Amino acid sequence: MKKRFIYHDEKSNKFWWIDYEGDSLAVNYGKVGSIGKFQTKEFDNEEQCLKEASKLIAAKMKKGYQEDPKFNFMDRYYFDDEEIGLHVKTSHPNFQCHFTDPLYMCCWDEESPFGSDEGADALNVLENSLRKEPDLDCADFPQMLIETMWGMKYIAMDSILEEDVRAQLLVDEMSTIQSNMITYATAFGQIKVMGKISHKLKKMGLNALARHQLTAKILQWGDGQDSPILQKMIDDLTAFPHEN
């Protein structure tokens, strides 16, 4: 459940919203027009969560905050709580509605968008970069992260032909794998933060997933079959409708 509030007087113009359901809640607050600060809290059970949410809401109303039914949840950026990390309640509503499989909030599966070290780092740096530069072209981010920030080599997502991927793996296996993972993490990361994805980055992300599927086959990971996790991500990203 989401509730949103506004406080306005001669000196202040602030917003505060809360999303609480199950055993966790998230709040976002700050000056109207700003991204604001995000905080997430988890509880042992739903009863404790509801009790804390009611307490927080009552405290805000006592201070003079008024509920704002017209608050726009869509045209906003969403960032994870730095102390808690990856969480569905600090994800854009479009991400929450479309990417419902638990794999998208998985912090340990190497194939999931943010479960690998590479994916987690990509999301963290992407969020920090978008805070500083909200108009950042996310399609440029994978190469910028790997080459400019990390001083390593980025392999472009141009080809999904098996012979091309095989040749790139022979020349530089680590860079090929890392580039795939960073690219599709960035694609899902843009949606998680902004609720939409550029047409260019969506194509790059789909190519990265296809290339990673081929990489698993070429390097004989697992049982030699296509990864159902990667295929699920391909299907879900393909079907995601919000592009710009």
Swiss-Prot record:
It holds the Pfam family WGR. InterPro entries: LolB, UCP026317_WGR, WGR_dom_sf, WGR_domain, YehF/YfeS-like_WGR. Gene3D superfamilies: WGR domain (2.20.140.10). Residues 1-78 form the WGR domain. This is Uncharacterized protein YfeS. The lineage of its organism: Bacteria, Pseudomonadati, Pseudomonadota, Gammaproteobacteria, Enterobacterales.
